[in-house]
Amino acid sequence: IANQKDGCTLLEITEALDIPKSSAFDIVKTLLYKKMIVEDQNHGKLKYKMGINAFIIGSGNIERLDLVEAAKNQLIETANHFNATAFLAILDNKMVTYLYKYEAPHRIVTNANIGTRKPIYSTALGKCLLAFQRKPEVIKDILKEIDFKPLTEYTITSPQKYLKELKRVKNIGYAVDFQEDSIYQICIAAPIFNHNKNVVAAISCTFLYDTNLRIKEIGEEMKRIALTISKKLGYIDDTGRRNIHGK
């Protein structure tokens, strides 16, 4: 249907898919219900064209591809520099969803891959994606639905402590997960913003737990890299005054 400017008739769909007309009708009916396609009778024949929801989904995927393209080279360079595993993630249905992953040659092995979904409260990525939301009600609504189950002995399980942690993250401009999601792992993340200054993603590097890890230095570097990526997405830095990256 998407490839036909004037849309398709039910017969054309049936022939293209090589399925019974009744089966094609069931598919069309479902797509109409989901607003993925719409009916068009302008030319005397009933045809089906792409609907608004198909456009919205397609646009969302394009934005995600643009996001990965903007961040990819920076993440590869950063992971190799720190000998770490780098991630790019977004907030999707109140879960952290990984869009991109790069592992340096001698990196720490992680169980997260592209498409993996993790709780927002146990990851540094999640902290960034929530702490920098511009509307306080968004944070409150998400916090209400979080079931703070301990994933390790270090997981924050108190809504009050987590809210305090979010305030700290917003103040310093980056987030740290101290073995809160996976034991023996530390994750350091920073937020990515779009042209409207909305947080749209976050990047992170994962390290093996080490008391000598230079967390502040790495955090500042992650902020710098995230800012570079944000500018590729049209974000304009507020030079000369405190900006949303905590500077």
PLM feature segments, named:
Residues 1-64:
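N-terminal helix-turn-helix
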Residues 2, 126, 130, 134, ...:
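Short amphipathic alpha-helical signal-transduction/dimerization elements
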Residues 16, 70-81, 172, 228, ...:
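Amphipathic alpha-helical regulatory segments at dimerization interfaces
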Residues 52-79, 110:
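Conserved segment of winged-helix/HTH DNA-binding domains
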Residues 88-93, 101-102:
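Short hydrophobic alpha-helical segments used for membrane anchoring or interfacial signaling
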Residues 108-180:
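Short, solvent-exposed recognition segments
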Residues 151-228, 232, 245:
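Extended hydrophobic
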Residues 235-247:
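Short, highly charged C-terminal tails/helix-capping segments
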